[in-house]
Each structure stands twice: as C-alpha cells, then as structure tokens.
From Swiss-Prot:
One Gene Ontology CC term in the entry: cytosol
Subcellular location: Cytoplasm
Keywords, comma-separated and alphabetical: ATP-binding, Cytoplasm, Ligase, Nucleotide-binding, Purine biosynthesis
Domain of life: Bacteria
Name of this protein: Phosphoribosylformylglycinamidine cyclo-ligase
Gene Ontology annotations of biological process type: 'de novo' IMP biosynthetic process; adenine biosynthetic process
GO MF annotation list: ATP binding; phosphoribosylamine-glycine ligase activity; phosphoribosylformylglycinamidine cyclo-ligase activity
Documented EC number(s): 6.3.3.1
InterPro entries reported in the protein's UniProt record: PurM-like_C_dom, PurM-like_C_sf, PurM-like_N, PurM-like_N_sf, PurM_cligase
Catalytic activities: 2-formamido-N(1)-(5-O-phospho-beta-D-ribosyl)acetamidine + ATP = 5-amino-1-(5-phospho-beta-D-ribosyl)imidazole + ADP + phosphate + H(+)
Disulphide bridges, residue numbers: none
Keyword Ligase: yes
UniProt organism field: Rhizobium leguminosarum bv. trifolii (strain WSM2304)
C-alpha cells in the first residue's frame, strides 16, 4: 500500500534535497556570470547552453572537444576539507588538451556528483571551475549537479568536465612539418597537477603525515594544501605564442604517462623525442615523493610530469622567438631536447642525462 498525506515519503526522505540544489544555483550565478565572453552571454538554468561562433570571431572553424576529470586528487580535497581549487584542475585538464591542438577554448560544462549536497562546498567547487574558465578565456555555460545517496558516501563527490574549442581550418596542431633536429621546449608545471595521485596518497600514507602537517617540501604550507596546488593552465600564453610567431609545430600536455606516453602522441612515426633529463628542473615535491616512496626514476617519469607540464616543438631558428613570447606571458621555458630519427618499433621518447631528484 502506498503512503499518502503527511505520512507519505518525500524526495528529501530518500536523501535528495531539491531546495539545496536550488540554493547552490543561486550561490554560483555570480561566478558563472564572471566567465562570460564573446559568443556566450546567457544565464545558467536553461535546458542547454548556447554559444555563437560568429560572435566569437571565427570564419571557418573546426570544433575540438575534450573531457576529463581530476582523479583521486579529489580524495585529498575531501579529506583536507579544501575545495576551492579542484575546479581549476578540472578546467585545466580539459582546456590544456584543447590548446595542444591549436584550439581556443570557447565553453565549458561540468558534472558534479555527490552523496549529499552541501551548497557551500558546491559553491566553492564551482567557484574554482569559474576561476579556471576565466584563466582559459572560456565561458561556463552549464552543468549538472547530481545528488546521489547510496552511490556516494556523505561528503564524497566526483567531478567531470567537458570543454569545446575551435581553430580556423588549416590552423590545427600538430603541423605536418615536424623534422629531425627540431627543438623540444618545456614549460614548467605548478606541481603534481592532476595525475598520479593514487601513488601520491600511498606515499603520504607511508610517511605517516596528516594533511594538516607542514609540507616537507614547502614548509610554509600544510601538506594537503601544497599537494592541492592547482594544475597550470597554459592556454593564453600558448595561444599568443602560436598567433604571434606562427612557429609552434606541436604541443603535448604532459599528464598521466608522463613524457613516454604523451610526447609520441603528437609525433610522426619516423621521429622520436630525445630528452635531456639534466635540463628538467623537478620541483621539491617530486624529490620528496621519490625519496619517501622509494620510487625509481623510470616510474617517476611515466607517472608524473616531473616539473614539465607542457612541451612545444619548434624549429631551431625559432627557439628564441617562441621562448620570448612565452616568457613574456609568465611561463618558465627550458630547452629539453630535440627530434631524432626513429626506427620502426622503437620508443617514441629516449633519454639522455640524469633526472635530479
């Protein structure tokens, strides 16, 4: 027999608070408005987000799409109760994948799933997403908040992001003229970024340190805060360098898999990247992780960015111009190596020198 009247069940009794969802929408509206750009000036709350490509200034665009998440870095945010920056990570993981194809990020949508919705926590997360969108120059045009009791424990949540960008036809990267002798430039990362955090968490567990302990590699910060340093967003400096110099042949976002998995994705089969490990300036966090976890160099290189979050391939005669354009926008640029001939079946990344950890 079904229940009715004041004894009947409600959605709230099942663990879903519609009022909390509505409150969250009101809390995040100012942050969402702050991401408006040409092509996107609507309000959230409709059934779909709109974007006007003509208003964005494109003539014959090719759309480029990417989606990603933040992985178990979220577990540190949850355990440390620090939610302000994981939204930046979410945006970064998507828009950095767009810019490596020469695309300008246009708009972003997020998916936020939780066991029990906390409007203040949700507003902090979406505030970070909006901050990432502002850094990337893309509009946050919509999203989905899913309260799912029974699927997630109270306090737990997961994030997914979806970004769409565009490039004029014929301007996509990588270009078809990558050649032996071309130079590989590395752009410094801000830290661990958003990959390898299952290993990071295992190492922290072995260390016996709590998230509130001073970070051994950054004594002015707590361990949780230091590890949650957001992923660097390279979009605006790279787009400016691409447009000003016209000399960037390829870009690779150094995420899970490190150099050996990510650099070959943008290279022709007959070329390999020769990396001088002595040129890699690994921040102290990586030395601490390697030392504390007894992680071998090979494993570090295929798990973490080790201090290089993005690489660019340019002809040797254009190194100075591209480096100057990037450095003018605040990037730290190092010469990492060069393109060499690659035999059939050989590795797409080879190393010289030693990584200082």
């Amino acid at each position: 027999m079904s229940q009715s009247g004041k004894n009947g069940l409600t959605y709230s009794d099942a663990g879903v608070d519609i009022d909390a969802g509505n409150l969250l929408v009101e809390k995040i509206k100012p942050a969402v408005r702050s991401t408006r750009r040409p092509g996107a000036d609507g309000e959230i709350g409709g059934f779909g987000g709109l974007f006007d490509l003509k208003a964005a200034g494109f003539n014959d665009p090719v759309l480029v799409a990417a989606n990603d998440g933040v992985g178990t870095k979220l577990k540190i945010a949850i355990d440390a109760d620090y939610h302000d920056t994981v939204g930046i990570d979410l945006v970064a993981m998507c828009v950095n994948d767009l810019v490596v194809q020469g695309a300008e990020p246009l708009f972003f949508l997020d998916y936020f799933a939780t066991g029990k919705l906390d409007p203040d926590q949700g507003a902090a997360i979406v505030g970070g997403i909006a901050a990432g969108c502002r850094q990337a120059g893309c509009a946050l045009i919509g999203g989905e908040t899913a309260e799912m009791p029974g699927m997630y424990s109270s306090g737990d949540y997961d994030l997914a992001g979806f970004a769409v960008g565009a490039a004029e036809r014929g301007k996509l990267l990588p270009s078809g003229d990558i050649a032996e002798g071309d130079v590989i430039l590395g752009l410094a990362s801000s830290g661990v970024h958003s990959n390898g955090f299952s290993l990071v968490r295992k190492i922290v567990e072995l260390s016996g340190l709590g998230w509130d302990a001073p970070a051994p590699f950054a004594s002015d910060k707590k361990l949780g805060e230091a590890l949650l340093e957001p992923t660097r967003i390279y979009v605006k400096p790279l787009l400016k360098a691409i447009r000003e110099t016209g000399a960037i042949k390829a870009l690779a976002h150094i995420t899970g898999g490190g150099f050996p998995e990510n650099i070959p994705r943008v290279l022709p089969k007959h070329l390999a990247a020769e990396i001088d490990l002595a040129a890699v300036k690994a921040p102290p966090v990586f030395s601490w992780l390697a030392r504390t976890g007894g992680v071998e160099t090979k494993e570090m290189l295929r798990t973490f960015n080790c201090g290089v979050g993005m690489i660019a391939v340019v002809a040797s005669e254009n190194v100075a111009a591209v480096s100057a354009a990037l450095e003018a926008e605040g990037e730290t640029v190092v010469t990492l190596g060069r393109m060499i001939a690659r035999d059939e079946g050989a590795a797409g990344t080879v190393y010289q020198g030693t990584l200082a950890l």
